[in-house]
Amino acid sequence: EQDKVSPAISTLQKLLKVYGLSLSEFFSEPEKPDEPQVVINQDDLIEMGSQGVSMKLVHNGNPNRTLAMIFETYQPGTTTGERIKHQGEEIGTVLEGEIVLTINGQDYHLVAGQSYAINTGIPHSFSNTSAGICRIISAHTPTTF
């Protein structure tokens, strides 16, 4: 403890045996805690949707993140269901197809290339009333999932 004694190899071997470690494990650097991912692969997206609506959350493992991004796919004739509300803001862009956004009692028909920006504290829903698939990319803050 005061750098005055150097343990014998036999003592070190006994300690390693007790702790179930190899010599290389004993002298290796401790593992760093998991860092949030910088690159997120498609296979790592978290599926949150159901009933013909796919909602894939981009999540990097950071529990303190303040922004959420979701890839949304609506099959023909599907909806998010009852109008929901949650704290925050949401913006999105229709990448393919068309969608009906219902908010504050009003329907908005959006097509590919159009975007929306809403206060998510107001009850809202999305419905694909068309015969084709609709794909949307959206961002939400603060994160609610």
PLM regions and their residue ranges:
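Recognition helix of helix-turn-helix/homeodomain-like DNA-binding domains
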Residues: 1-7
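DNA major-groove recognition helix of helix-turn-helix/homeodomain DNA-binding modules
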Residues: 10-25, 31
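Helix-adjacent hinge/juxtasegments
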Residues: 25-57
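A short glycine-rich, His/Asp/Glu-containing loop-to-beta-strand
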Residues: 45-82, 139-144
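Short, conserved beta-strand element in jelly-roll/cupin
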Residues: 73-74, 84-101
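Short beta-strand His + acidic residue motifs that chelate non-heme Fe in jelly-roll/DSBH
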Residues: 82, 101-102, 108, 124-130
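Short acidic-glycine-tyrosine-enriched beta hairpin
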Residues: 105-120
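Double-stranded beta-helix
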Residues: 129, 133-145
